[in-house]
């Protein structure tokens, strides 16, 4: 999920993506649904490895969780544990016809800065997070602008 810090092995980078890794949340409460990178996490590069990570965690794992903004306690905790600092406290953000909650983080990686924006929505008993990582604000915004929601309909049988 993160730009490759030449001192950190790729296994640790993958564990950062999935809080279900060792020392994190058990596999029963959090799942990474999608992790997409500009290049494979094992491949070192000069620039930040842009990424999109979609994860879902059962709301039942967080008693009292009533809105997406409250989920930023765990989100911020995970980001800070990975060396990020909060740049923008959680705020409402409109994506198409849906309002989500967004928080922004940054981390120095050698001579580069890694930016992370995480958007959260509560849906069907899950806290669903969309995390976008890039090396510039423009790169992150371009990734965020690619997110859209469509109205759910009845399943076709």
Predicted regions mapped to residue ranges:
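Long, charged/polar, surface-exposed segments that mediate recognition or autoinhibition
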Residues: 55-77
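Secretory pathway targeting signatures of secreted, lumenal, and periplasmic proteins
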Residues: 2-63
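Extracytoplasmic/periplasmic, Sec-exported soluble proteins
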Residues: 46, 63-67, 135, 139
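Short acidic, Gly/Pro-enriched loop/turn segments at secondary-structure junctions
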Residues: 2-14, 68, 139-140, 155-157
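Short amphipathic alpha-helical surface micro-motifs
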Residues: 16-20, 31-39, 67-72, 82-88, ...
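Short, well-structured beta-strand
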Residues: 49-51, 74-83, 87-157
């Amino acid at each position: 999920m993160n730009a490759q810090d030449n001192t950190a092995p790729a296994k640790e980078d993958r564990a950062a993506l999935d809080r279900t890794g060792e020392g994190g949340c058990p596999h029963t409460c959090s799942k990474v649904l999608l992790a997409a990178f500009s290049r494979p996490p094992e491949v070192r590069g000069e620039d930040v490895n842009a990424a999109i990570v979609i994860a879902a965690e059962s709301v039942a794992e967080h008693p009292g969780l009533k809105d997406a903004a409250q989920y930023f306690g765990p989100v911020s905790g995970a980001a800070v544990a990975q060396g990020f600092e909060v740049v923008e406290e959680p705020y409402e953000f409109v994506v198409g016809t849906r309002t989500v909650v967004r928080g922004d983080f940054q981390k120095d990686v050698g001579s580069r800065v890694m930016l992370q924006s995480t958007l959260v929505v509560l849906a069907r008993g899950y806290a669903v997070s969309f995390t976008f990582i890039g090396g510039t604000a423009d790169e992150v915004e371009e990734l965020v602008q690619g997110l859209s929601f469509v109205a759910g309909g009845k399943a076709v049988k």
